[in-house]
Amino acid sequence: MFFHVKARLKLKPRTAILCDNNEELIQTFKAVQKDVDGVIQALQIHKEKHGPEYFREMRTRIFESATERAARLIYLNKTCFNGLYRVNSRGIFNVPMGRYHKPAILDEDGLREASRQLRGVRIMKRDFHKLPALAKRGDFIYLDPPYHPVSSTSYFTSYTRDPFGAKEQSDLSEVYGQLCKAGCLVMLSNSDNPFIEKLYRKLSRRFKDVKIHRVSARRNINSRAERRGHINELVIVNYDTPRR
């Protein structure tokens, strides 16, 4: 969403903030922002050495420099199964290698463009509970939580070692309400799930501007190939959107 807004819509906000609770992701954004040349050089090495044994080594390897940690994360994302990011209870990346003939490990043009779009952006590790303290009236805020499982067999929210279950989803809906009260423009996306819909139907009774939309989105991550493809998602906004 961030890169779409900045690059495709060509918007230039006076202040832009990227927040996530995933330390690895935040450090990767910062490294691409501040040292894209170093990230590219490190990825070139990963590209040359890539193979099953090297991939397994990189899954557990811990680098000291932020640049090397960022390149490792990008390498693993580009070469793991379906580009899935998942960690265990110790915070260790545990996705197996994907079956790609020539994975696109190094996209130099894409990284340089990302670095350009990140100029002047504040990047910080923050739990979503702290968002209201950063927000002010008129701000646009996009919330992209771990999607709530749509079935008992699709339970996956392990983007960090901390759980993100029903309680966290409920807490997030309360934060959404606080942002509404503060006069922010808020968009949230999540799975098309009765539990999530119920949370925001309830919120819409408190804040009349809150609206729930169903949209079709393409998803490529599923253990069963026939279940990959277009699925419905919920997009919840508290402002008017153009009719299509």
Region roles according to the model:
Residues 33-142, 146-157, 171, 177, ...:
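SAM-dependent nucleic-acid methyltransferase catalytic core
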Residues 1-48:
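Conserved S-adenosyl-L-methionine
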Residues 19-20, 124-126, 143, 188-191:
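Short His-Asn-centered micro-motif
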Residues 3-9, 28, 134-135, 152-155, ...:
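A short acidic (Asp/Glu
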Residues 162, 166-244:
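Long, positively charged, glycine-interspersed low-complexity recognition regions
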Residues 1, 23-25, 79-81, 129-131, ...:
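Short, solvent-exposed loop/turn segments at secondary-structure junctions
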